[in-house]
């Protein structure tokens, strides 16, 4: 008898080497010889896992392909369906009674939902980059409707009946309600051992993966943060071996020392070819980092540990080049690891709302912004594809976004470190009204050397473009001017964990 690993998604049972996916992998520079083609898209490869004493189950969920019913996308009902499959598998005469789950993207998201259902025979999960709140991570991140990827996603689901349309639901239900609450797993009920993999650069999955890891109830949870894109990372031999140690321990009962693995391993990126991978830590952010506020100064366009007198900066909120920028230069090697937050005072001139986009970039000593292709193919073609879009394939720094009228905080889930918004009410701006926004940003793991800088860009448009090739950029409500207030009794600041070294 053997344990079984489940890969749950509506992408088909064994389409991992379908021509459309092979074309994508070729473009990304991934080596096709590393996989057998037996796996489903984004799932575990049976050629590897079966050779090491596991079965792999590739189900078609409700409504997908020949399965009955309608396709429901990321909901608690899907978690219940997944629960029933796990319990059925555990009862088969070839199964040891131990079941694990694995895979990235959809296959990771579904793991949050099934783990919250607590099937008795689920022994361990391994979500490899996946959203954990469909409204906040996909449909309306920052309260700003963004239907480009949902439209593309819906065309990936094939079945004989109906399929859920997330974009249409986003248009019909622009505020968080019971529908969107049903697409948030009950994190506190996730108590099974978990190996969670995340990155700083995934414009679709990064916030949700970190949220899932933070909020899950399990005391046996590990986080590994890598420095590239999920697909090459998932099939990398060293990472397969690492995941196998995890499953061998929890699905086979092997005493292989897995429990001594650092609870957090993170990437420290210099964005110049010398990233440090697998840095061990006791937490994220690591406990030896100090939360620091860098105050915006609209007059000097600087970020400083001390606040200046009150002043303002403004720009055309609808213009492609409209932005306010602020700089912080280091004179000693300085690490920034954890969750940035921007607390910023804003005013709308000529509008009753603002869609605000913020970006935190690393500049080298010559003042040039650094970026890093996240897939093996980093040649001219990929540079061109990612110049103004396909942000999942080219890391250009941390980002955040928020619609000013959706600024109300969710007291149940907000912290000083990571703000969370309720998105259940609209609070428009009155003429001349100045309001404070708290904007959560993608986590970072950056090291800067003497003479290098952080650059904070505050703007009215998403300068990195759509998440994937052919995904349209988010449309905004912006017109008129955005006025940024800094200093005095309206001290705007960037907060992030910092450690200086000699």
Sequence positions of predicted segments:
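Active-site-proximal cap/loop segments of hydrolase catalytic domains
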Residues: 1-259, 263
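Glycine/threonine-rich phosphate-binding loop and adjacent beta-strand/alpha-helix elements that clamp
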Residues: 239-240, 252-502
């Amino acid at each position: 008898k053997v344990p079984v690993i489940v890969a749950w998604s509506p992408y088909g049972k064994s389409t991992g080497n379908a021509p459309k996916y092979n074309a994508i992998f070729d473009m990304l520079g991934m080596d096709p010889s590393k996989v057998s083609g037996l796996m489903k898209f984004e799932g575990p490869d049976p050629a590897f896992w079966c050779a090491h004493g596991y079965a792999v189950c590739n189900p078609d969920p409700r409504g997908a392909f020949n399965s009955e019913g309608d396709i429901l996308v990321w909901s608690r009902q899907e978690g219940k369906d997944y629960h029933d499959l796990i319990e059925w598998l555990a009862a088969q005469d070839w199964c040891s009674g131990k079941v694990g789950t694995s895979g990235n993207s959809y296959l990771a998201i579904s793991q949050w939902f099934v783990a919250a259902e607590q099937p008795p025979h689920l022994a361990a999960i391994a979500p490899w980059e996946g959203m954990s709140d469909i409204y906040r991570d996909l449909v309306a991140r920052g309260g700003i409707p963004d239907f480009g990827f949902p439209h593309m996603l819906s065309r990936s689901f094939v079945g004989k009946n109906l399929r859920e349309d997330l974009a249409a639901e986003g248009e019909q239900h622009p505020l968080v309600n019971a529908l969107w609450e049903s697409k948030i797993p009950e994190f506190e009920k996730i108590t099974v051992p978990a190996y969670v993999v995340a990155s700083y650069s995934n414009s679709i999955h990064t916030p949700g993966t970190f949220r899932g890891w933070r909020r899950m109830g399990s005391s046996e949870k590990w986080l590994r943060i890598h420095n590239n894109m999920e697909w090459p990372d998932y099939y990398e031999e060293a990472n397969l071996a690492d995941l196998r140690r995890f499953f061998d321990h929890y699905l086979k009962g092997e005493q292989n020392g897995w429990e001594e693995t650092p609870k957090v391993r993170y990437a420290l990126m210099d964005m110049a070819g010398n990233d440090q991978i697998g840095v061990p830590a006791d937490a994220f952010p690591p406990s030896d980092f100090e939360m620091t506020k860098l105050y915006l100064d609209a007059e000097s366009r600087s970020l400083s540990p001390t606040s200046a007198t009150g002043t303002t900066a403004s720009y055309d909120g609808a213009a492609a080049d409209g932005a306010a920028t602020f700089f912080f230069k280091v004179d000693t090697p300085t690490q920034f690891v954890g969750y940035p937050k921007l607390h910023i005072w804003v005013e709308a001139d000529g509008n009753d709302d603002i869609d605000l986009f913020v970006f935190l970039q690393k500049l080298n000593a010559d003042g040039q912004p650094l970026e890093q292709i996240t897939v093996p193919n980093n040649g001219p073609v990929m540079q061109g594809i990612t110049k103004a879009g396909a942000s999942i394939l080219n890391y250009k720094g941390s980002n955040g976004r928020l619609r000013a009228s959706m600024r109300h905080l969710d007291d149940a889930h907000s912290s000083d470190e990571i703000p969370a918004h309720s998105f259940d009410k609209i609070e428009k701006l009155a003429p001349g009204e100045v309001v404070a926004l708290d904007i959560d940003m993608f986590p970072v793991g950056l090291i800067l050397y003497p003479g290098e800088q952080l650059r904070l860009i505050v703007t009215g448009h998403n300068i990195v473009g759509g998440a994937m090739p052919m995904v349209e950029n988010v449309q905004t409500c912006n017109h008129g001017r955005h006025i940024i207030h800094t200093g005095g009794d309206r001290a705007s600041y960037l907060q992030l964990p910092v450690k200086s070294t000699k």
